[in-house]
């Protein structure tokens, strides 16, 4: 029987898999762009932030591209969170995914052989009232062992005033945590919530300038306010 291809797996597909959901620290001894101290910090805290990827003159046309893509998406009836796997459709997104500084950071954290398998344009519209509850990316991804990371590139300035992402430092050492389906009253962009997440470590706001990036482990608890 021919199987249906899905870029984003269904929750039932993932729940039925046997997976190694432990944090596997970076063992890179000769990093390309990160310092040994940054590697140590990633292993300890589960993330790095304020990594300069693009200069102002480079990020401006990328922002313009995404503004146009967003307008086309909204005009088609989709919402601002629906632009997923865009690297398969748009050369600009592919160029970002394969941008040498981004690939070098991924290799320093994950090892020399990396696959950029996904992309998601995550855009909060002013006043939409949606939050992102505390969650772990590993809950959504069919990867084993758990050696996957997310690189977030800011195409505009992200700070507490516009609900930047927040990480819970060190929470990746807890393994895969129990989650529950999010309630409608949470107005969650996603569909999972880890309760009492603050008990697993310090909350760190990830404020980025346009052109900067962060990287975090797929087991790190993170979310953002409305």
Regions found by a protein language model. Give the residues of each.
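Non-heme Fe(II)-dependent double-stranded beta-helix
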Residues: 1-45, 50-143, 179-180
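Double-stranded beta-helix
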Residues: 21-22, 160-225
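Pocket-edge structural micro-motifs
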Residues: 51-52, 118, 153, 169, ...
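Juxtamembrane helix-loop transition sites at the ends of transmembrane segments
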Residues: 67, 73, 156, 187-190
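Active-site region of the double-stranded beta-helix
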Residues: 112, 138, 153-164, 170-172
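Short, conserved beta-strand element in jelly-roll/cupin
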Residues: 135, 142-160, 207-210, 215
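Short beta-turn/strand-loop junction motif enriched in small, turn-promoting residues
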Residues: 137-139, 156, 221-225
């Amino acid at each position: 029987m021919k199987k249906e291809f899905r870029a984003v797996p269904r929750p039932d597909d993932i729940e039925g898999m046997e997976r190694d959901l432990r944090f596997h620290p970076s063992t890179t001894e000769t990093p390309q762009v990160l310092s040994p101290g940054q590697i140590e910090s990633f292993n300890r805290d589960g993330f790095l932030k304020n990594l300069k990827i693009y200069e102002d003159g480079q990020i401006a046309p990328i922002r313009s591209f995404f503004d146009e893509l967003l307008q086309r998406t909204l005009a088609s009836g989709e919402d601002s969170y629906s632009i997923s796997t865009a690297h398969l459709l748009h050369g600009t997104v592919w160029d970002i995914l394969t941008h040498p500084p981004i690939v070098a950071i991924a290799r320093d954290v994950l090892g020399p052989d990396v696959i950029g398998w996904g992309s998601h344009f995550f855009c909060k519209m002013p006043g939409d009232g949606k939050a992102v509850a505390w969650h772990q990316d590993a809950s959504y991804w069919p990867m084993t062992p758990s050696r996957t990371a997310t690189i977030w590139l800011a195409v505009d300035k992200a700070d507490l005033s516009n609900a930047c992402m927040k990480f819970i430092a060190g929470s990746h050492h807890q393994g895969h945590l129990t989650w529950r389906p999010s309630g409608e009253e949470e107005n969650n962009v996603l569909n999972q919530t880890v309760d009492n997440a603050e008990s697993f470590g310090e909350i760190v706001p990830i404020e980025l300038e346009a052109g900067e990036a962060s990287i975090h482990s797929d087991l790190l608890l993170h979310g953002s306010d409305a």
